[in-house]
Amino acid sequence: MAKKTIRVRQTGSAIRRPKDQRATLVGLGLNKIGRERELEDTPSVRGMIAKVSHMVEIVEE
């Protein structure tokens, strides 16, 4: 069975954000506005996305 994936795009800057939020973006593989990553759809990834939801958007599930 194929694993479910989720595509995420960074829409906001990490400048003047707390270190934990910047680290979460790095953990998601994002570091510049406009970058997209396809990630495995797991509860831990969903939690990371929720933590920085003001800086990322879900492109497709």
Swiss-Prot record:
Keyword Glycoprotein assigned to the entry: answer is: no
The family note in this entry says: Belongs to the universal ribosomal protein uL30 family.
Ribonucleoprotein listed as a keyword: yes
- Which Pfam families does this chain map to? Ribosomal_L30
* GO cellular component term of the entry, any: cytosolic large ribosomal subunit
Name the keywords, alphabetized: Ribonucleoprotein, Ribosomal protein
GO biological process per UniProt: translation
> Where are the annotated coiled coils located?
none
GO molecular function term, any single one: structural constituent of ribosome
Disulfide bonds listed in the record: none
- Organism, as annotated: Maricaulis maris (strain MCS10)
Q: How does it assemble?
A: Part of the 50S ribosomal subunit.
Q: Which CDD domains match?
A: Ribosomal_L30
Q: Which domain of life is it from?
A: Bacteria
Q: Provide the protein name.
A: Large ribosomal subunit protein uL30
